[in-house]
Swiss-Prot record:
Protein name (Swiss-Prot/TrEMBL): F-box/kelch-repeat protein At5g15710
Keywords in alphabetical order: Kelch repeat, Repeat
SMART domains: FBOX
Region (Disordered): 19-79
């Protein structure tokens, strides 16, 4: 009967979603973005599948509800993950669907697991509270098998920060659902401070445990983590993590830091051997940024002397220089990895605040040169960076590029393929010490 009660709730919610359209999130909407590209405050119902299209005029991208009387905000605290806010509209209430005991009480386990595997990952935490058996659903091999074969939920933004007294906080913004979710992060050790990045459902952190530089990998949805063995050289390094889903393994690459010892060899951790291996020392170069980009089994860094890029081949463990000169008057630049072999350079151009602009280039591997592919519209640039001296952060995944600045409580998202700019707002982006990266929620990503 516990299962039956949940299916009545689940099916009734789906029916309501189909009849009344999708609800909108109550995260603060950016007012200076034009209506054709604003996505900051729209919410797709968490019961709707990833990538589903919103056909409701109120929930369609680019529309805003400007009438306060049409919207009623209801604070909620769902079980497990806490959804920030939910906005409900005065529409016709549909009665709960009546379920037949003889059908739903005898649902085969394999069919049940296949259905649950298609539920958005953040809803699984609510499902776990239905009964003791479902509380162990994440350890069920049958469920994990179905989950691994289902298409990805879609890209998310993971923000991490620490409140006083150093309590870790984490929120995830689902781009398909247009909703913020809070994830408990108290399972992390206190020394985990720097967010290295995310890949394939895993998130990597580093920090100083006393005088020892340590690295850990965790799965936020599974609340599981483990500390990696110590590197051969105990010094803070630039790190990047890559996951290979085909053999369920991951690697962490440690290179020379922009301010660190340049004579240290490159180290690579392989989860299959649980060891760090030593590789070629990066040739003597003057790095101009601590940001790295990984695509097509290659790691890229920016260099000033010699001018261009340093590329590390993960398969051979060798470094080589690429003489790709940067665009003229480039003030600051970030390397961003796209899909397949695409490598982007994002940065500001200009000498004075009135002449500055944000541009995006793509590396032409054949001609070894940067080709401009897009420019940030002036209104977005002025809203993102109100002062010419303001710093910004930039990161990307799957041809999506996200911009954040230190004095803004919102992020700017650019879709390279669709050429669409859109704002992302929410309380998780308002913390001055928050660290952000793209994140793919997965239950089958193992830290072992």
């Amino acid at each position: 009967m516990e299962r039956l009660g949940f299916w009545g709730l689940l099916m009734g919610s789906v029916e309501k979603s189909l009849d009344s359209g999708n609800s909108l999130a109550c995260s603060a909407s950016a007012k200076n973005g034009d209506e054709e590209s604003s996505t900051s405050s729209k919410q797709v119902s968490p019961l709707k599948g990833s990538g589903s299209r919103n056909t409701s005029p109120l929930g369609r991208v680019g529309s805003r509800n400007t009438s306060p009387s049409r919207q009623k905000v209801v604070k909620t605290k769902p079980r497990g993950l806490e959804e920030e806010t939910v906005a409900s509209f005065g529409k016709q209430v549909v009665a709960d669907v009546q379920m037949e005991d003889g059908i739903w009480a005898m649902l085969p386990e394999d069919l049940l697991n296949e259905i649950l595997a298609r539920v958005p990952p953040f809803m699984i935490f609510r499902i776990r509270s239905v009964c003791k058996k479902w509380n162990l659903i994440l350890q069920d091999n049958s469920f994990l098998k179905f989950h691994s074969n289902v298409s990805s939920h879609g890209p998310c933004l993971l923000t991490f920060w620490k409140n006083s007294p150093q309590i870790p906080q984490c929120s995830v913004f689902s781009l398909p659902l247009k909703t913020w979710y809070k994830i408990p992060f108290t399972f992390l050790p206190p020394w985990a401070f720097w967010l290295v990045g995310s890949s394939g459902g895993l998130v990597c952190f580093s920090g100083l445990d006393g005088l020892t530089f340590r690295t850990l990998v965790c799965n936020p949805l599974m609340q599981s983590w483990r500390t990696l063995p110590s590197m051969h050289y105990n010094q803070q390094r630039q790190l990047i993590m890559v996951v290979d889903r085909s053999d369920k393994s991951f690697k962490v690459i440690a290179t020379s830091d922009i301010y660190g010892d340049k004579s240290l060899p490159t180290e690579v951790y392989d989860s299959k051997t649980d060891k760090w291996s030593l590789h070629q020392i990066m040739p003597a170069v003057n790095l101009c940024s601590s940001k790295m980009a990984y695509c097509d089994s290659r790691l890229y860094l920016e260099t000033l002397s010699p001018l261009g890029l340093m590329m590390y081949r993960l398969d051979s463990g060798q470094w080589e220089h690429i003489p790709a000169k940067f665009p003229r008057s480039l003030l600051d630049g970030y390397l961003v990895a796209g899909t397949q072999k695409r490598l982007f350079l994002v940065g500001r151009i200009g000498l004075y605040s009135t002449l500055q602009s944000m541009r995006i280039w793509e590396l032409d591997h054949t001609k070894v040169s940067w080709v401009e592919i897009s420019r940030m519209p002036p209104k977005y640039f002025r809203a993102l960076l109100r002062l010419s001296a303001e710093r910004f952060e930039c990161f990307g995944q799957d041809n999506l590029i996200c911009f954040t600045s230190w004095n803004q409580g919102k992020g700017l998202l650019y879709n390279v393929d669709k050429k669409i700019w859109s704002w992302i707002s929410g309380c998780a982006l308002q913390s001055c010490n928050s660290q952000v990266c793209f994140y793919e929620p997965r239950f089958d990503a193992s830290v072992l």
